[in-house]
C-alpha cells in the first residue's frame, strides 16, 4: 500500500500508554513502507503526563506532528470554556512537544469572550503564549456554539452574545499583529472562519 500519512484517531491519542503508542507506531511503519508522517491530537494534560524521555521516544519511533488545542492564552477564558488546564500548563505542554522534536500545530479560537467580554485580553494573551510556545504552525478558528454544551445553552438563553463577523476579523487582525514566531505557517481557512487566510509569517 502506498500510504504516506496516518492520523491517529480520535480526540487525544497521546493519552494512551506510551508502550502502546510505540507498538502502534512500529506496526504502522512495518505495514506501510512508504509511510512518512504520523500525526495526532494532543491534549495538554495527557501531554504533561508524559516525561520528556517518553515524548522523545515517540518522536524517534515516528510520531511526526501533534495538534494542540490551545484555544486561548487567557486563564479566565480557559476557565470559562472548561478547558481543564491553566495557560501555564498549556504553554508547558506545547514546549515539551517542541523540545521532543515533534512538529507542533497549535489551534486557537477567536470569539471566545463574546461581545461583552475582554476580547483584547484574550487575543493578546493568546499571541503571547504562541510566541513563547513557538509552534511551526498555527490555525485560528472561530467560536461556533454547539447545542447541548454549557456555552451553547448560554447563547440560547441570551447570556452570551456571539461576536459579529467584523469583531472576529478585528480579533484576527490583532492576533496577526502581535505574533512573533519565525517562521510560522498561519491558516484561518476552517469552515468556521469568515475570511480564509493561509500564509507564512513574518
Name the predicted role of every residue range.
Residues 65, 88-150, 165-189:
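Conserved C-terminal portion of the radical SAM core fold
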Residues 13, 45, 73, 111-113, ...:
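Residue-level marker for beta-strand->alpha-helix junctions and adjacent short loops that shape enzyme
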Residues 16, 20, 53, 81-89, ...:
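Alpha-helix N-cap and loop-to-helix initiation/capping positions
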Residues 41-48, 113-120, 202:
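Active-site mouth loops of central-metabolism enzymes
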Residues 152-159:
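Short glycine/proline- and charge-enriched loop/turn segments
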Residues 2-99, 104, 180:
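Conserved SAM/AdoMet-binding glycine-rich loop
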Residues 193-202:
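Radical SAM enzyme core and accessory elements
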Residues 50-51, 79-81, 116-118, 150-152, ...:
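Short, well-ordered secondary-structure micro-motifs
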